[in-house]
């Protein structure tokens, strides 16, 4: 009961259900102020202060070089051991993959491993279109930005983040602060684990090793088992749509027709609608959906990436038998958690215990 109630409390603080969160549930540092022309922009307050040390006479605490090596190695190897068998593996840390992992991380009972072949996660979400800075997000995906506390300039049907990196860095920092998540960047997924017609994990290797198989002798991979794999590998390219391409190679799907020409208004709705479990054990999200279904590309608008990622997370939660927004069990869990005869909630809602 305690675990169920904690999960309900955590997952209900989501924009996925479609209703605007009350102000108290949003980032407390975010305020709303009118802008010229009637537009609204979330503004983040900040304060300046003197650093708590003398910048003219700074001296760091002494350390042995071997300690640094041991700390990095021990912690990384511990993570590899911990996540060798995990609940969900998210392949690809672009806007859809990060949104998916963030949503999953709200359930503290679900362990999430995010695998990204690049040193720098974020995919194409560090910039808008044509290497411009601003990110356009169509409504109602701005509710997800409200939840994260990302500032934006509000227009009638869309919002604009002044720099795409604000979204990517915020969702990433919020995600990585959760104790049930580990990001393995500079790691490539080379294959899938498939048993009896069900995807059961991924085959991994260092990204630089994966890129140099033709220049060295055999360099065998590692593996990571999981109950669910979420493939968010993006559209076609050297590392794009690799999940669905591999499914085609091994005969689990018939074809990967590729995405159609750009149509923003059709594309975003289609991407979210078609986000699903394409074969047992594997959910496809983001632009990889367009590759497998021949949906239009959307170009430089990012709302569908966020909402598709959230939907993929709730599909994964459903597959795990956890409260989710797909079958409405989040609301049922919340209703049970609301009865004082069943649970006691701490004042700050951080812990819930059996009554």
Swiss-Prot record:
Pfam family, one: Thi4
Keyword Transport in record: no
Transit peptide per record: 1-42
Signal peptide stretch: none
Key word Transferase present: yes
Gene Ontology MF terms: cysteine-dependent adenosine diphosphate thiazole synthase activity; iron ion binding; protein domain specific binding; protein homodimerization activity
Co-factor: note: Binds 1 Fe cation per subunit.
GO BP, sorted A to Z: defense response; DNA damage response; response to cold; thiamine biosynthetic process; thiazole biosynthetic process
Domain of life: Eukaryota
PTM comment, free text: During the catalytic reaction, a sulfide is transferred from Cys-218 to a reaction intermediate, generating a dehydroalanine residue.
List of residues binding substrate: 96, 116-117, 124, 189, 220, 235, 287, 297-299
Function text: Involved in biosynthesis of the thiamine precursor thiazole. Catalyzes the conversion of NAD and glycine to adenosine diphosphate 5-(2-hydroxyethyl)-4-methylthiazole-2-carboxylic acid (ADT), an adenylated thiazole intermediate. The reaction includes an iron-dependent sulfide transfer from a conserved cysteine residue of the protein to a thiazole intermediate. The enzyme can only undergo a single turnover, which suggests it is a suicide enzyme. May have additional roles in adaptation to various stress conditions and in DNA damage tolerance. (Microbial infection) During infection by Xanthomonas oryzae pv oryzae (Xoo), THI1 interacts with the type III effector virulence factor xadA from Xoo, which is an adhesin-like outer membrane protein. This probably attenuates the function of THI1 in defense response.
PANTHER family membership: THIAMINE THIAZOLE SYNTHASE, THIAMINE THIAZOLE SYNTHASE, CHLOROPLASTIC
HAMAP family with a match to the protein in the record: THI4
Name used for this protein in its record: Thiamine thiazole synthase, chloroplastic
Biological source species: Oryza sativa subsp. japonica (Rice)
Organism taxonomic ancestry: Eukaryota, Viridiplantae, Streptophyta, Embryophyta, Tracheophyta
């Amino acid at each position: 009961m305690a675990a169920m109630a904690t999960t309900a409390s955590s997952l209900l603080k989501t924009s996925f259900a479609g209703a605007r969160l009350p102000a108290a549930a949003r980032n407390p540092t975010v305020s709303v102020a009118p802008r010229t022309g009637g537009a609204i922009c979330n503004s983040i307050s900040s304060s300046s202060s003197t650093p708590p040390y003398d910048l003219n006479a700074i001296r760091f605490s002494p350390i042995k070089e071997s300690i640094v090596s041991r700390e990095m190695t021990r912690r990384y190897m511990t993570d590899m051991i911990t996540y060798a068998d995990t609940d969900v593996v998210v392949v690809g840390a672009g806007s859809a993959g990060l949104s998916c992992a963030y949503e999953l991380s709200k359930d503290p009972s679900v362990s999430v491993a995010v695998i990204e072949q690049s040193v720098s996660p974020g995919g194409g979400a560090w910039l808008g279109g044509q290497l411009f800075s601003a990110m356009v997000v169509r409504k109602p995906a701005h509710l997800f930005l409200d939840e994260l506390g990302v500032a934006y300039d509000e227009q009638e049907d869309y919002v604009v983040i002044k720099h795409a990196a604000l979204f990517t860095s915020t969702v990433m920092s919020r995600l990585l602060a959760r104790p049930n998540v580990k990001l393995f960047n500079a790691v490539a997924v080379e294959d899938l684990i498939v048993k009896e017609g069900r995807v059961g994990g991924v085959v991994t290797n260092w990204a630089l090793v994966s890129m140099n198989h033709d220049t060295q002798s055999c360099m065998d991979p590692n593996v990571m088992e999981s109950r669910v794999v979420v493939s968010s590998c993006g559209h076609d390219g050297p590392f794009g749509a690799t999940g669905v391409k591999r499914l085609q190679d091994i005969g689990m799907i018939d074809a990967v027709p590729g995405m159609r020409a750009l149509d923003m208004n059709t594309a975003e709705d289609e991407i979210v609608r078609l986000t699903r479990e394409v074969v047992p054990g594997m959910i496809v999200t983001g632009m990889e959906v367009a590759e497998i279904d021949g949906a239009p590309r959307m170009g430089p608008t990012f709302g569908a990436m966020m909402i598709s990622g959230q939907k993929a997370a709730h599909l994964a939660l459903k597959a795990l038998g956890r409260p989710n927004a797909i079958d409405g069990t989040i609301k049922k869990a919340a209703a049970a958690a609301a009865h004082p005869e069943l649970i006691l909630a701490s004042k700050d809602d951080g812990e819930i215990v059996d009554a």
